[in-house]
Design a protein with these regions (language model features):
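N-terminal intrinsically disordered/low-complexity leader segments
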Residues: 1-5, 195
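Hydrophobic/aromatic-rich alpha-helical bundle segments in the mid-to-C-terminal region
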Residues: 100-104, 138-185, 194-195
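Hydrophobic alpha-helical connector segments
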Residues: 55, 70-98, 149-156, 177
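Short amphipathic alpha-helical elements of helix-turn-helix/winged-helix folds
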Residues: 13-17, 92, 159
Length: 195
């Protein structure tokens, strides 16, 4: 489902509230105040808070699917695919730091098993894609084949998550794209075969 411009505005405002005040502060009153509409006007776009959070996760999933499709459509090597996926995440979160806070917030997912399941589905798609790039690179002799693709995925994406969290907690005190890119290159040097 394609979101209207107004729904995108509402989603961005909801993301900002969750990121800066917490999930409990995401109320129709606070959301309506933030975007300058009545509470009743919000219900034309979303039935309730659950639907709104589900749409936030759907929004993130669409963004993620877009980059995965871009990689599939491009002529990227497996190593370039890994780099493109990870660097795209750093660019996205640099542009939308509140989205990073929400997506990496365990508070959001412990409140509702539906949210947890939806986010696990998104993570599984990421895991499948990145592990596939790793496996292809191993088959091409570009990444050491004595390393587990699952463990490499956790190293690559786990370090990304830690870096984004560190960046958020420091109030964006460093260049996330540069630090992320430098970190990824360090990891790649460790896992790539010596040519």
């Amino acid at each position: 489902m394609e979101l209207t411009a107004r729904q995108k505005d509402i989603l961005k405002a909801a993301i900002a509230i969750i990121a800066n005040q917490g999930y409990e502060k995401l109320t129709t009153k606070n959301l309506a105040t933030k975007i300058g509409v009545t509470e009743a006007a919000l219900y034309r776009h979303f039935k309730n808070k659950r639907e709104l959070v589900t749409m936030i996760l759907g929004y993130f999933e669409r963004i993620s699917n877009d980059v995965l499709q871009e990689i599939r459509d491009g002529a990227y090597s497996p190593l370039e695919s890994i780099r493109h996926f990870v660097e795209d995440r750093y660019i996205l979160f640099s542009k939308y730091p509140d989205l990073a806070k929400v997506i990496f917030s365990e508070e959001l997912f412990k409140n509702d098993p539906t949210f947890k399941g939806q986010f696990q589905c998104i993570m599984h798609k990421h895991k499948q894609a990145v592990e596939n790039y790793i496996l292809q690179a191993q088959q091409e002799g570009k990444i050491r084949n004595d390393l587990s693709p699952t463990q490499l995925f956790r190293i690559i994406v786990g370090s990304m998550r830690f870096t984004v969290t560190q960046w958020n907690l420091s109030d964006c005190a460093f260049d996330l794209k540069k630090e992320g890119s430098d970190l990824l290159e360090t990891i790649m040097k460790l896992i790539e075969t010596k040519q």
